[in-house]
Amino acid sequence: MRILILMMLGTTLAFGETKPADTVERCQSMLTEAVHDRNPDGRKGAAEALSLVRLKDNALEFLGPMLDDHDVEVRIAVVTTLGDFRDSRTLPLLKKALKDPVPEVDLAAAKVLYQLHDPEGVQFLLEVVGKETKASSGYFTNEKRGALRMLHTPTKLFIYIGIQAAGLAPVPGLGFGLSSAQGILSAPDSSARAASLLLIGSSRDPTLADTVGTALSDKEWSVRAAAVHVVATHPFPQFREQLVPLLDDKKGAVRVRTAAAYIRLQSSAKVQPARQGAGIH
């Protein structure tokens, strides 16, 4: 029996021995082939898989050229993967993506930049929500601004941003508002502007209050609902009385959030949510 085991072991070693270096080379070849796959689903899968490697393993060398892919879903996957690294070395590529001609890619890049605490991210999102001013950064032309505002946000891109709701530390008995955010974003006619406002709802940017105040009377119901949500969760108690007219809003989703926000703000002076530090969520 012992001899048989030794023979079997020898056979296994003879036919199954593979050097680690050879396996690594094979893996790199597989990723390279996937990155250049003729099928966009294959390239998208490669971009997603690259979120599992490290930057020092040439991830950026793979991902950089993919930002020029002709398929939008591939470019969005690249931006998402760049965000997974949470590393400042990805910033040049993310800022390139911020200038993509397709609004969905721009928004995905802005979201990641905001999470990395890069000022260009929050500025871009504020401009999506607010009105064009002389101080606007010029990130996009009037045509792109119009396209961004007309965009109905793909739920899969933004549905989870309420989880960052928005940087609140747990407070017993105080709701995060996650369900409220998801409800707004999952509506088929919810806009990218509403998603952008929810995303920056925890920002300490000094212009956010003005943006929220203006959004309370926006023509799009999802933006009004998002503004009410941010008034409650940020919070902005100074807008409490401005909520009263929205109790008669023509959209039920706005009315019920307004009622809840008004009640919540009644005790906001007594219970203030503790905020986390500057860590990325």
Question: Could you describe each region identified by the protein language model?
Answer:
Residues 21-34, 54-68, 87-99, 118-131, ...:
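Amphipathic alpha-helical scaffolding segments comprising HEAT/armadillo-like alpha-solenoid repeats
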